[in-house]
Amino acid sequence: MRFCLVFIRLAAFVILSGGATSTTTDNDDTRLLQTSNIETAAVANVLHVMQSSESSKRLLRLNDQADISGHDEERSSLIEKGWKKLRKLIKKVWKYVKKPFKKTAKIIKKPFKSRTKNIHIVYYKSRF
């Protein structure tokens, strides 16, 4: 139960603090993967936390190639898949959260502006 709450807060923190540059490492591959796109960095970090390192590496590679070779559509579909995974995980874990916490927690949606569309970030605000 406590692990679920910690994981939700970790995922929300990773999304919100994606920053301007993201660096992810993989145990199989020692190379560092970097990107300067904020929403791509956030989704890549969440995917990496969710043990989808292959999707994470592919997303970062596509982000680097998007401006040059026109992979923007494939990149946006990978970003959307990452958000869907995160939403499903939050819904799955949310039913195990204790009722007193549910009363103090608020689900807040804020638009996150990107080049093409708004991406809604869901994070949890509590009294802790």
Curated annotation (Swiss-Prot):
A motif (RxLR-dEER) lies at residues 58-75. Induction: Expression is up-regulated during the early plant infection stages. Keywords: Host cell membrane, Host membrane, Host nucleus, Membrane, Secreted, Signal, Virulence. GO terms for cellular component: extracellular region; host cell nucleus; host cell plasma membrane; membrane. Residues 1-22 form the signal peptide. It is found in: Secreted; Host cell membrane; Host nucleus. The RxLR-dEER motif acts to carry the protein into the host cell cytoplasm through binding to cell surface phosphatidylinositol-3-phosphate. Secreted effector that suppresses pattern-triggered immunity (PTI) in plant host. Belongs to the RxLR effector family. This is Secreted RxLR effector protein RXLR-C09. It comes from Plasmopara halstedii. The gene is RXLR-C09.
